[in-house]
Amino acid sequence: MKLRQLEIALQRCAGFERPRASREQYQTPATLAARLLYDAFVSGDIAEKTVMDLGCGTGILAIGAALLGAREVRGTDIDPEALRTAEKNAALLGADVTFIAADVGSTEKIDPCDTVVMNPPFGAQKQNIHADRPFIDCALAIAPVTYGIFNAGSTAFVEAYIAGRGNITGRVAGTFSLKRSFTFHTRDLQEIPVEILRIVRA
């Protein structure tokens, strides 16, 4: 499957029915999800691999990994409603994905894998400052390779945070197209600069 084909397929995924601002529940744009997944695919980190989507939300990254030929794909999220939507999305696209209700703060229900893909919270809400740290910690604990979406300019922070535990071996700039989802949003569409980081466990 080519990049454009993947993007078109992922555009069919439904978003959150009732998104919660406190959890920064924003649907990962299909263009950005496809870019992350295709970079991972070209690097040999998807096909025939066991892939985990941490904080999978409605499942777009997990589903894309399955469409690119991952041997086994699992997605985990704390929100049961989001997981129900993820299951519907997977069925719609014929993707074989196992979705699990679990908190990334505890790895008891999260088995080791070859590759983690994730779009962790950016910590934009006051109550969510550093909300991406548990995701990074969990990813390093369960997989040798991680691909994550972070706010532009986060590379230095991530490098310092994972020092001695992992290294950033790839970085791709991108844009997160954020549609108006909550009353505090002042624009119908906001383009947020982001970066996709490839992290390899030390």
Task: Tell what function each PLM region has.
Residues 1-202:
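Class I S-adenosyl-L-methionine-dependent methyltransferase catalytic core
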